[in-house]
Amino acid sequence: MPVTHIISSIAPLECEGDVLSVNDLHFSYPDGHVALNGVSLKLCEGDKVALVGPNGAGKSTLMLHLNGILGGKGEVEIAGKKLTRENLPAIRAMVGLVFQNPDDQLFSPTVFEDVAFGPLHMGLPEEEVRMR
């Protein structure tokens, strides 16, 4: 059964140059689980936001859409740039991401894994990262 939460019944204030805009975002996992069902939101510069909810509510799934790790139906726009395959590197350069399991990035077993974490996750081949 889907969970629906009303975040605010107050109409959002207009702002110049939205920092983040999500419009009618939908995403289902391969097993059929609907994680996002028509999510829309707009954040302006300086907004402070908390995204809370129970396990499985779609919080992490939404975050993974904000820098193109997952793709669904709908539109995501970051600082005026639509999230498309063509401008994905530019979007990822503006959006930081910390994974849920801090052991995946904070405590690397080797110096190479620590230093290479960013370049590898931005799509550089391991051979090129090792040469640099």
PLM feature segments, named:
Residues S60-T61:
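Conserved Walker
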Residues S9-V22, H26-G38, A50, R85-N87, ...:
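A short, flexible loop at the N-terminus of ABC-type nucleotide-binding domains that lies
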Residues V52-P54:
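The feature captures the beta-strand-to-loop junction immediately N-terminal to the Walker
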Residues A57:
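ATP-binding Walker
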Residues G72-T84, I91:
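Conserved ABC transporter NBD signature motif
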Residues D103, P109-L120, R130:
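Short helical segment in ABC ATPase nucleotide-binding domains corresponding to the A-loop/adjacent helical element
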